[in-house]
Amino acid sequence: MNLPLFAALVVILTLIMIKAAEQVAYPLTGYFSSLVSDYLEANQKLAPFYTHAPSIDGVKAAMAARDLFNTPRLALVNALNKQYETVKATDLIIANIQSLKDSNTYTVTTAHQPNLFTGPLYFIYKIAHTIALSRSLNKQMPEAKFVPVYYMGSEDADLDELGFVNIGGQKLVWQTKQTGAVGRMLVDVELLSLIKLIEGQIGVSVHGIAWVNLLKQSFTIGKTIAQATLEIVHHLFGAYGLVVVQPDSPDLKSLFTSVIEKELTTGFSNNAVQQTIKNLSVHYKVQAAGRAINLFYLQGNKRERIVQTDAGYEVTALGLSFTKDQILADVQNNPANYSPNVILRGVFQETILPNIAFIGGGGELAYWLELKQVFADAAVPFPVLLLRNSFLLVPAKRALQLQKMHINTVNLFKGRPQVIIDSFVKANSVHHLQINTQMAAIEAQYTLIKEQAAAIDASLVDHIEALSHKQAQKLLQVQKKMLRAEKRKYEAEQQQITKIMEQLFPGGSLQERTENIADWYKIYGTHFVDAIVENSDDFSKGFTLLYLND
């Protein structure tokens, strides 16, 4: 299918699925830290911690900085061609990979670990954002080319975080005996049993069967999790030209050896990050703390810390020890054995890619803002940092209920259902349910009494203040009882609000942090992915609510 026809079909199908969309400013949702809010509002307190503003001008400045850096483009293309030998790449992906040889081609990147079956919805949203931003930049700057990239954090060893998925409100956990780097783990019978469970949950619909078949095709026995994740992401986003980078590669690690050696011999990254943390922590909570050496050693599936000793270096958990000369020789001979942690992971990414923008969640932005000096000391360009897009998917039935109850968008983010119920009852009751005016009048009377008593005996003041406080508490109890009595008249609406909130904010958390794409793919199929891409901002403007058609 040619690209113009594909694009036209995507737009038509998206219009069928999406009834309407609106946005809420991120700070109003209550789900984002003060650091993220300040970054989005260009607060000057954060200006020292990043290089380029999250804007088109910032992108242009990042492009100029990237042009001065010797990105290993040919080696990158060769490594990607090798990685894609096992996948039937689309013509657009092939063209995008080959274009990376050209000095006027840049990447827009998001990074994430290989969560089981793609994990939470924001995994999908992050990748869709890279596609939307790349598309926008290609339109605005046709003299250059921008390629969307998903950079897979396959060396992460936190199986507790990555080895489960929530589908249909049920948490499915991969009960494997494997340990170490999750991307290097193999699909086993325990994992296949989860696919069987998912089939029982969603296999009754045409799109549900399609999703299960995709899982079965991607996750076959003996295949690495990294390879399976590449295949499923390729199936979802390949038509958009998304390039998946698997950095756990000897070819790509060999491009990073100079930084690895510098870290081993000088510990430069920790020195840089500690001063930044000191400055940043004056105003904000620190997201990531560095170590003396911010590298792990990979052996098989094991990923363990490297520690410097008087005699050289040790990887205690693996029983390994090196002199300085031995470890430097090992870096040259076996670069794939060295795995950067959170402090150096971004430096590796920006070393091998011609990248100009990085898209991440609030937590990711928080630790990237600690890294500006690390990048400077490594002499690697620092990209534009962009907060990923966020979505709340509102089914047609729930949207209609909200409309009938006149509950506005911002109220949805107030948290607990009880807060929204109280607000709804107060807004719809024909009675006055608050006695603030009366309480203020009584407080004024106590103030007069206190002044009168103080003129007679100052020791009476404390007693009168205690009486005033006690009276205020009793009146608040009366107000609560009035509200409870009125709420009993709205039992049906209370039940509706509770069900709405349970669906839109499962477990009291954001939908995108809990649910998996399977819950929506089973209804809309591939149109779901298309709709997310089409409704993704380039430079994130707010938390997007998508009102869905049946």
Where are the language model's segments positioned?
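A translation/RNA-centric and nucleic-acid-associated enzymatic feature enriched
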Residues: 287-356, 362-373, 382-384, 391-395, ...
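Low-complexity, highly charged intrinsically disordered N-terminal segments
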Residues: 31-91, 475
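A structural-propensity feature for long, helix-poor, extended segments
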Residues: 159-166, 394-422
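N-terminal catalytic cores of NTP/NDP-binding nucleotidyl/phosphoryl-transfer enzymes
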Residues: 103-138, 360
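Glycine-rich phosphate/pyrophosphate-binding loops
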Residues: 120-121, 134-158, 383
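A glycine-rich helix N-cap at a beta->alpha junction
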Residues: 166-193
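Long, compositionally biased intrinsically disordered regions
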Residues: 18, 232-322, 418-421, 425-550
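Short acidic, glycine/serine/threonine-rich loops at helix termini
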Residues: 121-122, 159-165, 255-260
